[in-house]
From Swiss-Prot:
Organism classification: Eukaryota, Metazoa, Chordata, Craniata, Vertebrata
UniProt domain EF-hand: residue ranges: 12-47, 49-84
Signal sequence annotation: none
Record function comment: Plays an important role in catfish calcium homeostasis.
Identification of the protein by name: Ictacalcin
Organism for this UniProt entry: Ictalurus punctatus (Channel catfish)
One MF annotation (Gene Ontology) recorded for this entry: calcium-dependent protein binding
InterPro entries documented for this protein: EF-hand-dom_pair, EF_Hand_1_Ca_BS, EF_hand_dom, S-100_dom, S100/CaBP7/8-like_CS, S100_Ca-bd_sub
Amino acid sequence: MSDLQKGMALLISTFHKYSGKEGDKCTLTKGELKDLLTKELGGAFGNCSDQATLDKIFKDLDTNADGVVDFQEYATMVACTTMLCNKSLSKK
């Protein structure tokens, strides 16, 4: 398996590690998203213990406004975060 394939598999397995604990196994609830952001991305999303911050992040990610974050919305978040990290690291 190539490095890129391993990265894709990790992206998928990380999503499913947190999804389905509170509801549908193919989506993330707000609580599941909070756990994922806190445990997997640390400070990259600021203070996720602040409810207003979490609500804003969730609203921005839930682009179809169905009350959950699906895999496509999650993958978009990871891709955008990766682009921001790349941009920051490229400046150094």
